[in-house]
From Swiss-Prot:
Binding site for spermidine: 139-140, 262, 309, 335-337, 344-350
Gene Ontology molecular-function annotations: deoxyhypusine synthase activity
Miscellaneous remark of the record: Present with 7600 molecules/cell in log phase SD medium.
Enzyme active site: 350 (nucleophile)
Reactions mediated catalytically: [eIF5A protein]-L-lysine + spermidine = [eIF5A protein]-deoxyhypusine + propane-1,3-diamine
Pathway of action: Protein modification; eIF5A hypusination
Cellular component terms per the entry's GO annotation: cytoplasm
Protein's recorded name: Deoxyhypusine synthase
Length: 387
């Protein structure tokens, strides 16, 4: 202690000059990127993420999210030949080894945005095993195949836009004509689906409802309807198209909460007295059964609300997910599910206590492209970890 400090009152010494405990050897030093160094120029996404891990705040959470995604992708269990028949219900890799079942959820605004192409990439290349989205996440994907969405501004006035037939999603603009084109496209499909439903009921009788787990049965569930839309749109820019082609189910428990709901409502008048029926119970059985069959379960939740809880609740059926990555801007002070951190889900049994989890507080559009570039699309081989 210096001479000056020795002359300070003891109270000041204790308050301001309090000694620290010894720093543990495993403490990580905060450090950012030194762009004056040659290796910091033209960095790959993987290198950038590695450097962000030690920056602190949400940059470190981005790094943690990438680590967890890599972990859920790398886990491997037994080979299918080592299993009894009743154990062969989960997901397997191309070599026949058990792998993590990855559930991805996203809100409709992300499909409206340019993140749609990132989400399509993940489904196109079979990097997720099931999807949960809201009605807008279904219809906006289809509508973008028919007409584009445009960049606007957050500050554009609602009255003026309404007069011009322009719908605003944040700083995006969707011409109302897009929804008119959507109606023209979807109504004939709904007509055909109703026809197939009626023919099936006539052939099999009322008991055909018992066969609703038959994927070819036109007793429609939301996921079956969405699969049909993906088949009908036949457009490689579409998430739904690739989900249909790769047999990846897209669940939407709120299918009527959007333009699709409007179309179904309009169709009730057109088809009356006949009605298209949609069974939500069939889908809750399907997604919960997927969770129960999973050898390990991972959640990638982009946004909040229904899509977040629907996946988390499915994971409750297996006593919790093994991995969880949340990305949203929700805060927990109001008790909202969107704002809740992973530890709250642990209390409900929706995430395992020993699970790897993180909540990244960020706008998905700003971080997901970077995260995907550093993980799913990095080009680096998956380091398969057998356990």
């Amino acid at each position: 202690m210096s001479d000056i400090n020795e002359k300070l009152p003891e109270l000041l010494q204790d308050a301001v000059l309090k000694a620290s405990v010894p720093i543990p050897d495993d403490f990580v030093k905060v450090q950012g990127i030194d762009y004056s160094k040659p290796e910091a120029t033209n960095m790959r996404a993987t290198d950038l993420i590695e450097a962000m891990k030690t920056m602190g705040f949400q940059a470190s959470s981005v790094g943690t999210a990438c680590e967890i995604i890599d972990s859920m992708r790398s886990w491997r269990g037994k080979h299918i030949d080592e299993l009894d028949d009743h154990e062969k219900k989960g997901c397997f890799d191309e070599e026949g080894y058990q792998k993590t079942t990855i559930f991805m959820g996203y809100t409709s605004n992300l499909i409206s945005s340019g993140v749609r192409e990132t989400l399509r990439y993940l489904v196109q290349h079979k990097m997720v095993d099931a999807v949960v989205t809201s009605a807008g996440g279904v219809e906006e994907d289809l509508i973008k195949c028919l007409a584009p969405t445009y960049l606007g501004e957050f500050a554009l006035k609602g009255k003026s836009l309404r007069d011009q037939g322009m719908n605003r999603i944040g700083n995006l603009l969707v011409p109302n004509d897009n929804y008119c084109k959507f109606e023209e496209w979807i109504v004939p499909i709904l007509d055909k689906m109703l026809e197939e439903q009626d023919e099936y009921v006539k052939k099999h009788g009322a008991d055909c409802l018992e066969a609703n787990q038959d994927v070819d049965s036109p007793i429609w569930t939301p996921s079956k309807m969405i699969d049909r839309f993906g088949k009908e749109i036949n457009d490689e820019s579409s998430v739904l198209y690739w989900a249909h082609k790769n047999k990846i189910p897209i669940f939407c428990p709120s299918l009527t909460d959007g333009s699709i709901g409007d179309m179904l409502f309009f169709h009730t008048f057109k088809a009356s007295p006949k009605q298209l029926r949609v069974d939500i119970v069939g889908d809750i059985r399907k997604i919960n059964s997927m969770s129960m069959a999973a050898y390990r379960a991972g959640m990638i939740i982009l946004g909040g609300g229904l899509i977040k809880h629907h996946i988390a609740n499915a994971c409750l059926m297996r006593n919790g997910a093994d991995y969880a990555v949340y990305i949203n801007t929700g805060q927990e002070y109001d008790g909202s599910d969107a704002g809740a951190r992973p530890d709250e889900a642990v209390s409900w049994g929706k995430i395992k206590a020993e699970a790897k989890s993180v909540k990244l507080f960020a706008d998905v559009t700003t971080v997901l492209p970077l995260i995907v570039a550093a993980t799913f699309a990095s080009g680096k081989p998956i380091k398969k970890v057998k356990n």
